[in-house]
Amino acid sequence: MHKILVRSNHKPLIGKIKINGSKNAVLPIMAASLFSNSSITLHNVPDLIDVHLMSELLKSLGAEVNFICNKDYKANHTLEIDCSNINNHLISHEIASRLRASFLMLGPMLSRFGRVSTVFPGGCNIGKRPVDIHIKALEAMGAKIEIDSCNITATTKGKLQGKEITFEKVSVGATENIIMSATLAEGVTTINNAATEPEVLDLIEFLKIMGANIEVNNTKITIEGVEALNGCEHKIIPDRIEAGTYALAAIITDGELKLEGVSLSDIECIANELKTIGARVELHDDGIIISRKNGSIKSAHVATNPYPNFPSDMQPQLMSAMSIAGGISIIEENVFESRFAHANELRKLGANISIEKNKATISGIKSLSGANLHANDLRSTAALILASLVAKGETTINNSHHLWRGYEAMHEKLNSCGADIFVSS
């Protein structure tokens, strides 16, 4: 079992941190590489467990994947993908059960080969994230989908058909899946109430470079099917969640961090909320500098919602900061159910948090104390590390393997700025 030991030295974090490419952008783009018979080259790819799992999935289908990974975490990584020899429609059940993004292969495989078999996807256990919305939309486009226990088989006779699809609820994954499904469909597909996160727009940009015909008008996305897509090169956008996490590390420790490779426009919806709790944001040509303005962290009332609002993936980290804020803070979680598991662990550090349905009330205290903690998912692991940076004494975070699904070399980056973090397997 992976463990992370954090020794609080009560030092403000000061230094520079390079922000890697976005995990939530690169995974759907890797799935979209299935469309092309030519080579795909992706730059600014993060070295993460989920990227390696998606690479293994592509290889299991017959693709050639070459991850050019620099040992220096400060360097950029490149991923080369060639799907010209895909010879298998069965997505590995073992890998798919561990990787939620595997479900994004459904649309590309169905569009290109007319058949795909997989299982319900895995990933973080943070409540219900049903795939019914994906399935209903694909069925509307002409797919026949059979579900047997945890197994899913999708087939189509000929091409998928363009349709007008309106999502009852905004869904990033479903939006991405249907965009990809529609690129080679016959006719025009319109998605209403579509997700427009930067990661979705990066996927669209990638598909357009490949030759797709896609237009975005607010939350309406129109895709006109084309005959084929080509190979291309593409640079993955910066990871706004990683940037937001390190921004909070600066605020929590009353330090000053320069986040390199990211601009304010990349994290504007996050930065706006951080300013309400007392963050100072300075713009530079090669990044942004985050620090705390004056005195203690301020309390706030924050609600998570689809983009362009505050993202759910930043909620656990924000709760860590609010644990030592002045006054009473409230967080409303409106995206995922059961995303307050980290609150129980923060309480072990002394945090004063009460939960009622989708609302967390945090009464800020002056200081936290080290404890033995158990991580539940990716973002809660990051949140516990942030809180441990200012908890008196030592904190051990067990089950911390989740962290490497979304953060490359987090302990090294923080240690280079003054933290004292040790990782053991």
From Swiss-Prot:
Annotated binding of UDP-N-acetyl-alpha-D-glucosamine, by residue? R100, K169, V170, S171, V172, D313, V335
| Location of 2-(S-cysteinyl)pyruvic acid O-phosphothioketal modifications | C124
User: What EC designation does it have?
Assistant: 2.5.1.7
Q: Which UniProt keywords apply?
A: Cell cycle, Cell division, Cell shape, Cell wall biogenesis/degradation, Cytoplasm, Peptidoglycan synthesis, Pyruvate, Transferase
What's this protein's function? Cell wall formation. Adds enolpyruvyl to UDP-N-acetylglucosamine.
Q: Which organism is it from?
A: Wolbachia pipientis subsp. Culex pipiens (strain wPip)
**Catalysis: reaction(s):** phosphoenolpyruvate + UDP-N-acetyl-alpha-D-glucosamine = UDP-N-acetyl-3-O-(1-carboxyvinyl)-alpha-D-glucosamine + phosphate
| UniProt-annotated location(s) | Cytoplasm
Q: Which biological process terms from the Gene Ontology are attached to this UniProt entry?
A: cell division; cell wall organization; peptidoglycan biosynthetic process; regulation of cell shape; UDP-N-acetylgalactosamine biosynthetic process
Task: Tell me what gene encodes this.
Answer: murA
Q: What is this protein called?
A: UDP-N-acetylglucosamine 1-carboxyvinyltransferase
Sequence similarity: Belongs to the EPSP synthase family. MurA subfamily.
